[in-house]
């Protein structure tokens, strides 16, 4: 029903799309993609982005570090990561911002500002969506409450399904694509999944309320109030996009800071550098140009729980990856595989694909008959080390709470949304 409701939004073009990991969400389904024609009454809807604005994934690749070499040191590495990575609800981050002026630099500069302040290297920005910074951000469109929530959380993982996971490449499907990505069987990687924390949540809350009140002024009626929306070109639409871009920059800076904390751990414990393969959001609305009915049109592409998947030779790709397409990073669960895919030509869903396994049990259902300690012990028997802040949080994220990620990936591959490159298996997981 949510996919059908999205299809009624003013200005929608082509279709309302559901990715293979689709499940129920706020307004839009999670795993939903829709684009609206910016110049023909197209709207923007915060429900099409979600509360965790710019939630996304980045993958770090261990330079010359093999799974067998890491294995004896893995417990020590996980203990160090446990201490180095702030996480949990309301947790303070690794970067203590001195004032709101510095926060505003983060909101407009994203990962680029973090790198300029010494938290990373220039190559990191080449491997980030939009070079690590989304243009059009305006902190003036953000409430004091949202700014206050963001001030103390930069450089923290959060809770829920957010994680930092040490992984190893288990299988390579496309050696030609895997080579420039630095992926070979046994290669150690680190996947980071988090977003814009309380700041992004508050921005969504604020602008949904504003749009609910504003829709009448634009003559808009929607079948579900959670689909509150306004024209992209309206003052309300522009205000949301400016605030959303600021949250996107916060999310990118957040992952950049966690990257540096992880690099320090690996440098100290293994002497191995970690190179960034790619960083991409899966909760975002972006103004893009796509062919619509034979003409190039400016459209607002909503991707909620959906990963951008650019094809080979797209102008936004870094030169080293242009021939193979954008790396698409799709995590599984604590006990299952994650995947690296690559974008393909001909993707009908505005170059979008799945973003994860897709939840099938609510957090309450998942935790009802399972203890976090039992899950931790079960995973330990399989050689997977879990470090969490709460037993309930681990129980809520048990592998059985999600769809079979292998099936989600196969559906993405077979339907022409992306192609499989490599399969990664978990070695250790830091959970919020």
Curated annotation (Swiss-Prot):
Its cofactor is Mn(2+). SUPFAM superfamilies: Hypothetical protein PH1602. It catalyses: a 3'-end 3'-phospho-ribonucleotide-RNA + a 5'-end dephospho-ribonucleoside-RNA + GTP = a ribonucleotidyl-ribonucleotide-RNA + GMP + diphosphate; a 3'-end 2',3'-cyclophospho-ribonucleotide-RNA + a 5'-end dephospho-ribonucleoside-RNA + GTP + H2O = a ribonucleotidyl-ribonucleotide-RNA + GMP + diphosphate + H(+). Pfam families: RtcB. Mn(2+) 2 binds at residues 55, 193, 282. One of its GO terms (biological process) is tRNA splicing, via endonucleolytic cleavage and ligation. It comes from the Bacteria. Keywords: GTP-binding, Ligase, Manganese, Metal-binding, Nucleotide-binding, RNA repair. It is an enzyme of class 6 (ligase). GO terms for molecular function: GTP binding; metal ion binding; RNA ligase (GTP) activity. Mn(2+) 1 binds at residues 52, 55, 162. Its EC number is 6.5.1.8. GMP binds at residues 161-165, 282-283, 331-334, 338, 355-358, 431. The active site is at 355 (gmp-histidine intermediate). One of its GO terms (cellular component) is extracellular region. Binds 2 manganese ions per subunit. Induction: A member of the dormancy regulon. Induced in response to reduced oxygen tension (hypoxia), low levels of nitric oxide (NO) and carbon monoxide (CO). It is hoped that this regulon will give insight into the latent, or dormant phase of infection. InterPro entries: RtcB, RtcB-like_sf. Belongs to the RtcB family. Monomer. Ligation proceeds through 3 nucleotidyl transfer steps, with 2',3'-cyclic phosphate termini being hydrolyzed to 3'-P termini in a step that precedes 3'-P activation with GMP. In the first nucleotidyl transfer step, RtcB reacts with GTP to form a covalent RtcB-histidine-GMP intermediate with release of PPi; in the second step, the GMP moiety is transferred to the RNA 3'-P; in the third step, the 5'-OH from the opposite RNA strand attacks the activated 3'-P to form a 3',5'-phosphodiester bond and release GMP. PANTHER family: RNA-SPLICING LIGASE RTCB HOMOLOG. GTP-dependent RNA ligase that is involved RNA repair. Joins RNA with 2',3'-cyclic-phosphate or 3'-phosphate ends to RNA with 5'-hydroxy ends. This is RNA-splicing ligase RtcB. It comes from Mycobacterium tuberculosis (strain ATCC 25618 / H37Rv). The gene is rtcB.
């Amino acid at each position: 029903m949510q996919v059908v409701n999205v299809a009624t939004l003013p200005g929608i073009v082509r279709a309302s799309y559901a990715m293979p990991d689709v499940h129920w969400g706020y307004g839009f389904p999670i795993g939903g993609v829709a684009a609206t024609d910016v110049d023909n009454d197209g709207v923007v809807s915060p429900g099409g982005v979600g509360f965790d604005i710019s939630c996304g994934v980045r993958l770090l690749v261990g330079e010359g570090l093999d799974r067998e070499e890491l294995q004896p040191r893995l417990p020590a590495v996980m203990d160090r990561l446990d201490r180095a990575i702030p996480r949990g609800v309301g947790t303070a981050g690794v970067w203590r911002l001195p004032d709101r002026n510095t926060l505003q630099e983060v909101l407009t500069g994203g990962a680029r500002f973090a790198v300029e302040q010494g938290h990373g290297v220039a190559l990191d920005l080449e491997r980030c969506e939009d070079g690590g910074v989304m243009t059009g951000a305006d902190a003036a469109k953000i409430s004091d409450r949202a700014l206050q929530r963001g001030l103390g959380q930069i450089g923290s993982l959060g809770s829920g399904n957010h994680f930092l996971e040490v992984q190893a490449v288990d299988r390579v499907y496309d050696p030609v694509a895997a080579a420039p990505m630095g992926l070979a069987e046994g290669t150690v990687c680190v996947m980071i999944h988090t977003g814009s924390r309380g700041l992004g949540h508050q921005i969504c809350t604020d602008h949904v309320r504003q749009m609910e009140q504003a829709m009448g002024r634009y003559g808009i009626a929607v079948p579900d109030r959670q689909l509150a929306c306004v024209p992209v070109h309206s003052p309300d639409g522009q205000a949301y996009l400016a605030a959303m871009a600021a949250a996107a920059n916060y999310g990118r800076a957040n992952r950049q800071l966690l990257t540096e904390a992880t690099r320090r751990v690996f440098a100290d414990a293994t002497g191995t550098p970690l190179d960034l393969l790619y960083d991409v959001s899966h909760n975002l609305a972006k103004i893009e140009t796509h062919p619509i009915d034979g003409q190039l049109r400016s459209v607002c592409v909503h991707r909620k729980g959906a990963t951008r998947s650019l094809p080979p030779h797209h102008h936004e790709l870094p030169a080293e990856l242009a021939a193979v397409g954008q790396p698409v990073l799709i995590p599984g669960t604590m006990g299952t595989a994650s995947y690296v895919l690559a974008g393909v030509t001909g993707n009908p869903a505005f170059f979008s694909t799945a973003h994860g396994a897709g939840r099938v049990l609510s957090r309450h259902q998942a935790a009802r008959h399972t203890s976090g300690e039992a899950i931790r012990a079960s995973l330990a028997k399989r050689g997977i080390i879990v470090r969490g802040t709460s037993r309930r949080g681990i129980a809520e994220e048990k592998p059985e709470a999600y769809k079979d990620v292998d099936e989600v990936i196969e559906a993405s591959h077979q339907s022409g949304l992306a192609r499989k490159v490599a399969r990664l298996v978990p070695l250790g997981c830091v959970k919020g």
